[in-house]
């Protein structure tokens, strides 16, 4: 499920328009949105968030903006593949790409995921220490240094 639409990308393109004859076409932009949505869902699933996210509305709005930013960067890169240099569309592409990657990093570290998001309990990695955070594991002699300060050999 894509969080954003063609209209969200078009709003970020300013004077550039999308239709069935442009490069990329609206169908191709829909495919870009699907790719970005898949990337968002993959990151959130790895953190235990149930996807696709449907609530809270503020978080789905955030995801819509983030997905649209990533698709806008890709769309502009397709529209202007040879753009480079100061003052070129390259700076605009970098801006939207920065919005996408920055938001994706915030999702990865969990800082963009609000409380109230439905979490899944299936498939998350676990270990003795994650299941028993207050227990200290007795490592025996393995944790003792082989050479001790002040020891006479």
Regions found by a protein language model. Give the residues of each.
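Alpha-helix boundary/N-cap detector
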Residues: 24-31, 62, 66, 87-91, ...
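Surface-exposed polar/charged interaction patches
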Residues: 39, 46, 50, 69, ...
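Elongated alpha-helical scaffolds
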Residues: 61-75
């Amino acid at each position: 499920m894509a969080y954003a639409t063609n209209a969200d990308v078009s709003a970020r393109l300013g004077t550039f328009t999308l239709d069935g004859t442009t490069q990329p076409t609206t169908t191709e932009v829909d495919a870009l949105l699907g790719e970005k949505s898949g990337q968002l869902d993959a990151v959130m699933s790895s953190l235990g968030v149930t996807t696709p996210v449907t609530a809270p509305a503020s978080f789905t709005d955030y995801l819509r903006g983030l997905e649209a930013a990533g698709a806008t960067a890709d769309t502009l890169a397709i529209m202007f593949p040879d753009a480079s240099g100061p003052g070129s569309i390259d700076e605009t592409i970098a801006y939207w790409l920065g919005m996408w990657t920055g938001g994706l990093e915030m999702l990865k570290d969990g800082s963009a995921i609000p409380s109230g998001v439905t979490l899944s309990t299936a498939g998350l990695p676990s270990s003795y220490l994650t299941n028993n955070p207050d227990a200290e594991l007795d490592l025996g002699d393995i944790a003792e240094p082989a050479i001790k300060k002040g020891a006479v050999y």
